[in-house]
Amino acid sequence: MTERFDTAFHPFVIPFLAGMAFVLAVCLIKAAIVVRELDKADRRKWILSLIHPNIIIKNGIDIILDCLIHVRLWKRNRLLGFMHSSIAFGWFMIILLGHLQVLIYCPERLSTFYYPIFFDYFIEGGQYTWISRMLDAFLLLVLAGISLAVIKRIWSRLFGMRRTTRPTFYNLIGLYSLWAIFPLRFLAEQCARAGDLSVAPWWAYSISLCTFMVVLPFGRYLHIPAEMLLITFRNAGLEIKKPHKGMARVQADSCPNCGVCIDACPMNADPANLKDSTVYLTRQLRRGNAERVREISDKCMLCGKCTQVCQVGVDGPKLRILARAARKYRINPDFSNAGTGGGVRAVNKVLYFSGCMTALTPRIGLSVESVLKKAGIDYEWMDRDGGLCCGRPLHTAGRLKEAAGLVRRNEELIVGSGAAVLLVSCPICYREFKERYRLPGIRIVHYTDYFCELMEKGLLNFEKSDVCYVFHDPCELGRGCGIYDTPRRLISKAASIAEAPKNREESICCGGSLGSLSLDFRRREKITQASLENLYGSKADAIVTACPLCLSTFARYSDRPVKDLAQIVDEQTKPI
């Protein structure tokens, strides 16, 4: 193996060097801006995490699994996962092996930055080594991924995607230059190995690299470096606190524009809502288009399905809530009319909080009370005759300060009751209690978990019916709080159960969500019908859910019975 030229330089390396210098400079500046936008405590927390051994290891593992192998996409669609991982992992291995090749065979050139990229032009005989054969194998892997990407542009359904994003001008330039890089590299290397030292293919290869790197910071491919930064932020325990800065900015930059969230979004039962998916929210956040950010943020139902399917984990609901919170309001409630009384006394008892929506569907509260009596539980019903809201509607509307005031007042009442357990029947309230309340010494539990515990202790005597139910996973209970199994265990004890085609994490929102500020009833009805059609696919006799909002929404449109799980448990149990 010998060098072909006395000097290890040719002008065709200049575009590559210019592109690399540009992308490194811009990305470092963008990263510095993001870090500076963090508050002082978060910035210190992040810096300390970078020297913590366990977090360093976790960062490395997560970057490999999420940025190179794309494990989440593999779980969603194997062909889609292979396409992304073959390009990302294959390119990474080409870079790694290229540097290893220089280190082994011409270590004196290791400091020449571009040498591993154009190795076959400067070195003769390099194709006969084992490392060269590995490089060829990974290049073929990348070319296979590029071929699939071209097919996906034509036939996205093959990859499990009915809809894809509309590419911007910058994204198209980045896409086509990325597609050109690897065929041009293959052509240039084959020419050099055949003894043809024509520089035309090397110029084309270098220019395509330069084009991709120049476009990268301004389009979808910014997600490549941004996602790595996001992983370190997330593993440091940082959360989104500002609507367009810091963690919010890096989440928006990390969106790969893959479009998986478009099919997942339940609002897209109406095609008019396609442009309001999270992928377009992040695009408008990057552009600084405040008007479109407001429109997209207000329409969303905050069901969380986009976050569930996102390969990066972009928190669409949180980004929208903070965008809503950035607005100024003229009315500032203080809840002074709530009084200062001690509230319900439930010392060492179960304190049942039914919530506003259960007040509108009283059969749920009565069923919960009946089951508690059958099991012999000592309880008090906190808001039997009315009470304060949990605060979640204010929180999702972006009224964070007002919601916090309501939370503090409720905390006083609940802690002052002396209760040992706070039992909640509304998953909307349950999530707010779990995430935002400080109730020392009080266990917060949803009735599905609590009833399951009573069943396991032998305090509930079930009689099984011959009705077959399909369970609708409420957004807040399932994706919001991770409760999927206990409702199904209760149903299977009381009756037979069937599953809808899309269930658990993939469950479709009922359409009645309190999260949307602007979605009208006509468009909500389409979402509800789509959710019901999914449930009808189970061929079950009746529908059961564990959310008063889902119950009231489905009951208006369903052609078969709809019940809350508390009703089923009450109907199918008798006193011990």
Task: Give the label of every model feature segment.
Residues M1-G246, I262:
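Membrane-embedded alpha-helical bundles of multi-pass integral membrane proteins
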Residues F22, I29, D42-W46, L222-L238, ...:
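Primarily the internal scaffold of c-type cytochrome electron-transfer domains
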Residues K75-F82, N268, D298, F335:
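Short coil/turn segments at secondary-structure boundaries
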Residues A180, L184-A188, A192-D196, I231, ...:
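Iron-sulfur cluster-binding electron-transfer modules in prokaryotic oxidoreductases
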Residues M213-L216, N257, A264-C265, Q308-Q311:
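Conserved catalytic-core segments centered on acid/base and nucleophilic motifs
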Residues A236-G259, S277-L302, A530:
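Ferredoxin-like iron-sulfur electron-transfer modules
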Residues L302-G304, Q308:
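EF-hand and EF-hand-like Ca2+-sensor regions
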